[in-house]
């Protein structure tokens, strides 16, 4: 059993190892340059420069140098691994902004077109205003005529009321005068009838009228 476990661990270890060619290719890809020759030149120049600086004591390797180297390697790895993701995110963000700007532009264009359509509908506003003004003038004229007619009707009603009152007054005055005249005549007749001379005169006149009737017969 221990040997089987050791064999399994060894097989897993070898299966997880990266191919040296692939690793070398990834290192070359991380070095700036357009082709393999230029990248190799950059790498060789960097190595020779480092050896020269260290051998001539122009640069002394210390803890800070190690930390700086590790940090630089970390930055290179992060840039290598995170570069595509950041590029994809940046492309997506730019595309999103482009879509937002295009949508805003389309909305603004539609709003401008709608405004132009509304204005084009009002191209006959002058004629419409003139027609409305003419109608309003006719309406004012009709209202003035109606008001004048109403005033005339009111005046006629008031005049009729005054005339009716005057006629009623005259009728009442005439009736009083006739009543007074009748009462005066009746009173005079009654007074005359009570007078003996008047009675004698009436009797004599009546006898004469009868005699005339007999004479004609």
Curated annotation (Swiss-Prot):
Superkingdom of source: Eukaryota
Membrane-protein topology: Multi-pass membrane protein
Keywords, alphabetical: ATP synthesis, CF(0), Hydrogen ion transport, Ion transport, Membrane, Mitochondrion, Mitochondrion inner membrane, Transit peptide, Transmembrane, Transmembrane helix, Transport
Main localization category: mitochondrion
Transmembrane segments: 41-61, 66-86
Keyword Lyase belongs to the record: no
One annotated GO biological process: proton motive force-driven ATP synthesis
Segment forming the signal sequence: none
SUPFAM superfamilies according to UniProt: ATP synthase B chain-like (SSF161060)
GO molecular function, one term: proton-transporting ATP synthase activity, rotational mechanism
InterPro entries cross-referenced by the UniProt entry: ATP_synth_Bsub_B/MI25, ATP_synth_F0_suB
Record's keyword annotation contains S-adenosyl-L-methionine: no
Presequence positions on this chain: 1-14
Family of the protein in this entry: Belongs to the eukaryotic ATPase B chain family.
Assembly, per entry: F-type ATP synthases have 2 components, the catalytic core F(1) and the membrane-embedded component F(0), linked together by a central stalk and a peripheral stalk. The central stalk, also called rotor shaft, is often seen as part of F(1). The peripheral stalk is seen as part of F(0). F(0) contains the membrane channel next to the rotor. F-type ATP synthases form dimers but each monomer functions independently in ATP generation.
Function: Mitochondrial membrane ATP synthase (F(1)F(0) ATP synthase or Complex V) produces ATP from ADP in the presence of a proton gradient across the membrane which is generated by electron transport complexes of the respiratory chain. F-type ATP synthases consist of two structural domains, F(1) - containing the extramembraneous catalytic core, and F(0) - containing the membrane proton channel, linked together by a central stalk and a peripheral stalk.
PANTHER family reported for this sequence: ATP SYNTHASE F(0) COMPLEX SUBUNIT B1, MITOCHONDRIAL, MITOCHONDRIAL ATP SYNTHASE B CHAIN
Name of the protein: ATP synthase subunit 4, mitochondrial
Organism: Yarrowia lipolytica (strain CLIB 122 / E 150) (Yeast)
Gene responsible for this protein: ATP4
